[in-house]
């Protein structure tokens, strides 16, 4: 799950987002293979789920042609280094009603962003 990170619509068949370091890097391990992004509404008045099916490329931030766009709108509440740009070429979409998604009132971003890294250091 990703939160607090803007999803940029590049064109009708392409989206991208800035990825940050964290407890793992599973997205990069599957670059070039199938990827599914799920976007959903948790508001009371607008239930919806959209799945974006495609193929991702993963590029270090400093080497990405989308670098300027990605850095123009970083996630202010994520206190982690920026890692890479995930660029997804969309091959298909699917929508569903979203009424199974709970209504959610946003309180705050989590502030314990280093927690996953602590486990990695113990296991290393």
Could you describe each region identified by the protein language model?
Residues 1-124:
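Binding-site signature for planar aromatic cofactors or substrates
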């Amino acid at each position: 799950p990703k939160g607090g990170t803007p999803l940029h619509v590049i064109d009708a068949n392409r989206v991208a987002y800035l990825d940050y370091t964290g407890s793992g890097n599973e997205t990069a391990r599957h670059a070039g293979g199938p990827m599914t992004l799920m976007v959903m509404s948790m508001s009371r008045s607008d239930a919806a789920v959209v799945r974006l099916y495609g193929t991702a490329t993963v590029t270090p931030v400093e080497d990405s042609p989308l670098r300027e766009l990605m850095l123009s709108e970083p996630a202010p509440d994520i206190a982690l280094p920026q890692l890479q740009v995930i660029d997804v070429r969309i091959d298909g979409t699917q929508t569903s009603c979203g009424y199974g998604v709970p209504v959610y009132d946003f309180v705050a971003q989590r502030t314990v962003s280093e927690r996953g890294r602590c486990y990695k250091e113990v296991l290393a």
